[in-house]
Amino acid sequence: IRDVAVTGVQTCALPISDRGALARGIDDFRPRQSQTDMARAVADAIARRATLLAEAGTGTGKTFAYLVPALLWGGKVIVSTGTKNLQDQLFLRDIPVVRKALNVPVTIALLKGRANYLCHFHLDRTQQNGRLTAREDVGYLREIARFAKTTSTGDKSELSRVPESALIWNLVTSTRDNCLGAECAHYQDCFVMRARKEAQQADVVVVNHQIGRAHV
């Protein structure tokens, strides 16, 4: 918490109380003692720069319990999840809801592996090759080309009309081995580089465990 001597661990319990910020700002929010206890434990660990291993059962409200002290803290926060679906849920729903309820001006970034981001270079090359024979792949490529002109993130999860498991994505995303880096003509517009830059600048970064292990 920004100044432990002033705010103390108790500060983190206040937003979760029955008259706190979360109750006022989130519909159907109901405080739970186990949730308050966990929030205090997380806040205490942050204040002491200690390691905390917390296990809580279903219905505890674990997400809000760690997000409240994390967002009230003034330092960099990395939230790591087990799946990309949970990443998206945190980034798109849970964190914005808690941030609004707490009225804290923290910035948020979402960072996934490079295989999740459309690559302009490989998209251009695939379009120019014209080697796709399956009608489904041709249709998917057309959808991806349209997506490339409108997306600000390049995150393939945003394009629901093309399944994330579709093989066409292998042709329009990059790997560490075939990425041209700074030599690429699209480097300034690279979605991977943009996501990494935003993650460096953000107060809260949402990653998955694979990315977390690779970069921490």
Predicted segments, located by residue:
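Single conserved hydrophobic/aromatic residue that forms the stacking wall/gate
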Residues: 1-12, 212-215
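Conserved pre-motif I regulatory segment
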Residues: 13-53
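Walker A/P-loop NTP-binding motif
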Residues: 43-44, 63-76, 93-97
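A substrate-engagement module of RecA-like helicase motors
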Residues: 15-25, 76-203
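Walker A/P-loop
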Residues: 47-66
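Short, flexible loop segments at the rims of nucleotide/cofactor-binding pockets, characterized by
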Residues: 30-31, 55-58, 181-189
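Conserved two-lobed SF2 helicase motor
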Residues: 202-212
